[in-house]
Design a protein with these regions (language model features):
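Catalytic cores of alpha/beta
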Residues: 2-11, 44-53, 69, 89-105
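Glycine-enriched alpha-helix->loop->beta-strand junction motifs that scaffold or abut catalytic
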Residues: 10-16, 30-37, 51-56, 77-81, ...
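Core segments of cupin and vicinal oxygen chelate
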Residues: 145-183, 205, 212, 223-228
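C-terminal helical cap(s) of enzyme catalytic domains, especially alpha/beta-barrels
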Residues: 29-33, 115-137
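Glycine-rich phosphate-binding active-site loops on the catalytic face of alpha/beta enzymes
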Residues: 19-25, 58-68, 102-125
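N-terminal beta-strand motif that seeds the catalytic metal site of vicinal oxygen chelate
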Residues: 133-158, 191-198
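Vicinal oxygen chelate
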Residues: 126-127, 139, 181-187, 211-229
Length: 229
């Protein structure tokens, strides 16, 4: 309702998410300067939302309406539309949703179950929320980098590791790799002796998350493909 939206904004809300699509509520929220994310389930509702100038809509209930496979099909005609799936999203399928680049975020009550709130079990809510963040980021050890002084030194070290452990040898432009697990750089890189590379499912989300811990990333070291990924 208008009253609920007003109270949410007065309480400091910066965006409004609704279960369904009500054009009147969307227009009212936009008139108040709110970022509106209404619930949609059909192409018709999505087109109405786009006609109002929205670029992001909620997809609800997600699993019952076909899940990420449905959204990938809808992405054909709606290439610029972004989605926020909720409904049936949980720790087991969260990564599958977020792997699709037209999904900006996911929501789910599995992190804040009603009984946990009633029991004031904040520790369990915290654990589930942290688990969701870890799942979203998908951090894993990618490789260890070793600084070498020359291409010959890098080649020699990589071949030694490959011979000793049966790793696959791969020559690259700036380094030589042993099974993608060890990168021997052809010239000294960052770090005194080398680096530890941590992989993530989303660089932008990882940069934001690490920033909360005081980690500063160097933008000049970022490499992207033709699509900016």
């Amino acid at each position: 309702t208008h009253d609920q939206l007003d109270r949410a904004l007065d309480a400091g809300a910066r965006f409004i998410v609704s279960p369904g699509f009500n054009p009147d509520m969307v227009r009212y929220g936009l008139s108040k300067g709110a970022l509106m994310v209404p619930g949609t389930a059909t192409p018709g509702e999505m087109e109405q939302a786009m006609a109002l100038g929205l670029e992001v809509v909620k997809f609800f209930p997600a699993e019952q309406n076909g899940g990420v496979a449905k959204l990938k099909a809808l992405a054909g005609p709606y290439k610029t539309l972004k989605w926020m799936p909720t409904g049936g999203v949980n720790a087991k399928n969260l990564a599958d949703y977020l792997a699709f680049d037209q999904i900006v975020a996911c929501g789910g009550t599995w992190m804040v179950k009603k009984d946990l709130i009633q029991q004031e079990n904040w520790a369990e809510i915290t654990r589930l929320s942290r688990e969701a963040v870890r799942t979203m980021l998908g951090f894993s050890l990618d490789h260890v980098g070793i600084n070498c002084g020359s291409e010959a030194e890098a080649d020699r070290l990589a071949r030694t590791l490959c011979d000793m452990f049966g790793f696959a040898y791969q020559m690259g432009n700036s380094s030589v790799q042993a099974l993608h697990a060890v990168e021997c750089t052809k010239a000294p890189g960052r770090g005194t002796h080398g680096h530890i590379a941590i992989a993530t499912s989303n660089v932008d989300r990882a940069v934001y998350h690490l920033g909360l811990y005081g980690v500063h990333c160097l933008p000049e070291t970022r490499k992207t493909d033709a699509k900016g990924k």
